[in-house]
UniProtKB/Swiss-Prot annotation:
<dbReference type="GO" id="GO:0008360">
    <property type="term" value="P:regulation of cell shape"/>
</dbReference>
<feature type="binding site">
    <location>
        <begin position="97"/>
        <end position="98"/>
    </location>
    <ligand>
        <name>substrate</name>
    </ligand>
</feature>
<dbReference type="Pfam" id="PF01177">
    <property type="entry name" value="Asp_Glu_race"/>
</dbReference>
<dbReference type="GO" id="GO:0008881">
    <property type="term" value="F:glutamate racemase activity"/>
</dbReference>
<comment type="similarity">
    <text>Belongs to the aspartate/glutamate racemases family.</text>
</comment>
<dbReference type="InterPro" id="IPR001920">
    <property type="entry name" value="Asp/Glu_race"/>
</dbReference>
<keyword id="KW-0573">Peptidoglycan synthesis</keyword>
<comment type="pathway">
    <text>Cell wall biogenesis; peptidoglycan biosynthesis.</text>
</comment>
<feature type="active site" description="Proton donor/acceptor">
    <location>
        <position position="208"/>
    </location>
</feature>
<keyword id="KW-0961">Cell wall biogenesis/degradation</keyword>
<feature type="compositionally biased region" description="Polar residues">
    <location>
        <begin position="1"/>
        <end position="15"/>
    </location>
</feature>
<dbReference type="InterPro" id="IPR004391">
    <property type="entry name" value="Glu_race"/>
</dbReference>
<dbReference type="GO" id="GO:0071555">
    <property type="term" value="P:cell wall organization"/>
</dbReference>
<comment type="function">
    <text>Provides the (R)-glutamate required for cell wall biosynthesis.</text>
</comment>
<protein>
    <recommendedName>
        <fullName>Glutamate racemase</fullName>
        <ecNumber>5.1.1.3</ecNumber>
    </recommendedName>
</protein>
<feature type="active site" description="Proton donor/acceptor">
    <location>
        <position position="96"/>
    </location>
</feature>
<feature type="binding site">
    <location>
        <begin position="209"/>
        <end position="210"/>
    </location>
    <ligand>
        <name>substrate</name>
    </ligand>
</feature>
Length: 287
């Protein structure tokens, strides 16, 4: 049986409802270098189920953790601009800790809509710790960012902060979301600096949006009773407040859509996952 030819820039399934059936909704762009931002999107969608969501990820330049700050700023500006030219955006969430630490000032200077960033949840972790030892698990770029060091200086002076930067763990999270198995031995190797401590952190800040995707596996490797904290819920509350504070907010009747920077076998395999998150279409974003 013959099938309709598919646009080389699009992977999709048939829309269940037509555009005319959809009420206008404010459009929120969620951006990450990979699929870790879906953990933040989940938190936002739970609080704001009726927004029009766009998820964009940079699978060409992924991962950002080893890139220069200058490269990340220019790349994020380019991608957000490309999306903004196609959709009337009400808000943008940079669901990437590495990108947030360097790109927010430039984004807020260029665009009129609010831009929300993700920063390590150090302040709540300090409140939760019982032994006074808090671990920050993030990319190397986030661990060494001046913004992160400022957060520690402001909120964690009474605690011992153990920093652990790993881009390998980002790759592990991506593998899991693509349907792969997470080897616990790999996690043990990554976390060895903490696991070998006489008094390891009892509270861990998941300072990369990929890492909440691995909470079950991390719990099997970390000492029993270790608490894990991320900023997803706080970002969702901030997003809700900013949306509610806008007057004459721009809206769209389009269905949710995901954008990548290149279509390949990996993105083809990722489509069912994106559909399960509420994104029926995946397209290449021309930049």
């Amino acid at each position: 049986m013959a099938t309709k030819p598919q646009d080389a820039n699009t992977t999709s399934r048939e829309a269940i409802t037509s555009k005319a059936d959809s009420p206008p909704r404010p459009t929120a762009l969620i951006f990450d270098s990979g699929v870790g931002g879906l953990s933040v999107y989940q938190e936002i969608r739970q609080l704001l189920p009726n927004l029009h969501y766009i998820y964009a990820f940079d699978n060409v330049a992924f991962p950002y953790g080893e890139k220069s700050g200058e490269f990340i700023v220019e790349r994020v500006l380019e991608i957000v601009t490309a999306v903004q030219q196609r959709h009337p955006l009400a808000i943008v969430v940079i669901a990437c800790n590495t990108a947030s630490t360097v790109s927010l000032p430039a984004l807020r200077e260029r665009f009129a809509f609010p831009v929300v960033g993700v920063v390590p949840a150090i302040k709540p972790a300090v409140r939760l710790t019982r032994n006074g030892v808090v671990g920050l698990l993030a990319t190397r770029a986030t661990v060494h960012a001046s913004y992160t060091l400022d957060l520690i200086a402001r909120f964690a002076t009474d605690c011992k902060i153990e920093l652990l930067g790993s881009s390998e763990l980002v790759e592990v999270a991506e593998t899991k979301l693509h349907g792969g198995v997470v080897p616990l031995e790999v996690l043990k190797k990554i976390l060895h600096p903490w696991l070998s401590m006489r008094e390891p952190p009892d509270t861990i800040v998941l300072g990369c949006t990929h890492f909440p995707l691995l909470t079950e596996e991390l719990a099997q490797v970390l000492p029993e009773g270790t608490r894990m904290v991320d900023s997803g819920a706080a970002i969702a509350r901030r997003t809700a407040w900013l949306i509610s504070s806008q007057e004459n907010v721009v809206s769209s009747q389009d269905e949710n859509i995901a954008y990548c920077m290149a279509l390949d076998e990996d993105t083809d395999a990722l489509l069912p996952v994106l559909q399960s998150y509420g994104f029926p279409k995946l397209q290449k974003l021309p930049i």
